[in-house]
Amino acid sequence: MDNKYKGTKTELNLQAAFAGESQARNKYTYFASKAKKEGFEQIAALFLKTADNEKEHAKMWFKELNGIGNTAENLSAAADGENYEWTDMYEEFAKTAEEEGFTELAVKFRAVGAIEKHHEERYRALLKNLETSQVFEKSTVKVWECRNCGHIVVGTKAPDVCPVCNHPQSYFEISEENY
């Protein structure tokens, strides 16, 4: 993922634009939720519409920075980002919070850091599956479920096409029953 703006002020501007639009999108979704809870459906809908616009603005700047690669590159970048968050960022935030007497916040920072570690592990496992061609084929029998229609297939490989709804193999995942 080559970035033609590397080392320029324009790169910093693009990064700031991406960060600003991303934060605005999240804030507007939170504001929409609050407006909805307070009984203001139209206002909630406008916040969500604007949030969708901000998402597209952020995507535009992120693409300009060549931040979106192929799935393997994206999984690797995501894992690296999660690693930074749990090994450096949240631990430093927790230490600072403790030094400043905010012990409850330090506990929250560390708890979120533990979640980020899980995110990293999940992305790395998915990347390994992708690199070893084990996304839709396993060495042991699994229960595969079509994400579109719910059709169940038992075997080592998801079908190329769902025999019920004709959606492609990409719609199959290993079925989890955690209830």
Spans of features found by a protein language model:
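Non-heme di-metal
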Residues: 1-179
